[in-house]
Regions:
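GH16 jelly-roll
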Residues: 21-264
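Bacterial N-terminal signal peptides
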Residues: 7-15
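Bacterial N-terminal signal peptides that target proteins for export
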Residues: 1-7
């Protein structure tokens, strides 16, 4: 992939972007990392090799109305080694797919990665994230956890930009790091990897192995679960949709440091 000299550079995100956004930036250096190069070993994974969602690992998340759409099992397909989260219209309502590991797999710390092909259109958006079950019960992220947005793709921000974020303390005093934007040419074409390294001191966000951001705020120190979602549109985004559309996931992998006890 061509880097086009964007190491450490910033690209201004188009007006009307999603909430408070930082300028998009290129990777922090030319170094390309893998989980293994950072000292991690595979701990949990799903390669989606079957012909149905593995119920021991995943469940449909929040089936029913969501924003101006509906989370539907009809929008979830496992076939030919891929999980596809679809977006399509049925009876005048946008149907989308969303799955999570809540109640099946929860952990803290490690290197979380997926390989995926992002959606083609706007309005809807693909996301790969981690969330605590306690996030709305208190304001201390160490105790109540956080929402860690490893990757979100809002096409209106630009076809070569993906977003990351951390939120905690759901409610009137919610805190956020504000949107971090990573620029990598061609990220909306074909398959790419999106990852976060979560430690007791920081979150580090990666795209295709390149390090883009380090965050030292909102650090969760409790177990959380993984979510893959195709998010339905908001009112102002309906006209930007091009349905049907899809978000295709090749794998999800979680790595741990060698000898690390995931319960500590």
């Amino acid at each position: 992939m061509k880097m086009m000299g964007w190491v450490g550079a910033a690209v201004l995100v188009a007006a009307g972007s999603c909430g408070a956004q930082r300028p998009a930036q290129g990777p922090m250096s030319d170094t390309k990392y893998t989980a293994e190069s950072l000292g991690y070993s595979l701990f949990w994974h799903d390669e989606f090799d079957g012909d149905a969602l593995d119920g021991s690992k995943w469940a449909i998340r929040g089936e029913g109305p969501r924003a101006l759409g509906r989370v539907s099992r009809e929008a979830i397909e496992v076939k030919d080694g891929y999980l596809t989260l679809k977006a399509f219209e049925k009876d005048g309502v946008v149907q989308v797919g969303m799955v999570g590991t809540q109640g099946r797999f929860m952990t803290k710390y490690g290197y979380f990665e997926c390989r995926a092909q992002l959606q083609r259109g706007g309005g809807i958006w693909a996301a790969f994230w981690i969330q605590s079950t306690l996030i709305a019960k208190g304001e201390d992220p160490a105790t109540f956890g956080a929402e860690i947005d490893i990757m979100e793709f809002f096409r209106k921000l630009g076809k070569d930009i993906v977003s990351h974020n951390v939120h905690w303390a759901y409610g009137p005093h919610q805190q956020t790091t504000h949107g971090m934007q990573s620029y990598l040419e061609g990220v909306s074409e074909g398959f790419h990897t999106f990852a976060v390294e979560w430690t007791p001191k920081r979150y580090t966000f990666f795209v295709d192995g390149y390090k883009f951001y380090e965050v030292h705020q909102g650090i969760s120190r409790i177990e959380e679960y993984i979510i893959l979602s195709m998010e339905p549109p908001q009112q102002e985004e309906i006209s930007k949709m091009k349905l049907p559309d899809e978000y295709i996931i090749d794998y999800v992998r979680v790595y741990k440091k060698k000898g690390q006890d995931p319960k500590k």
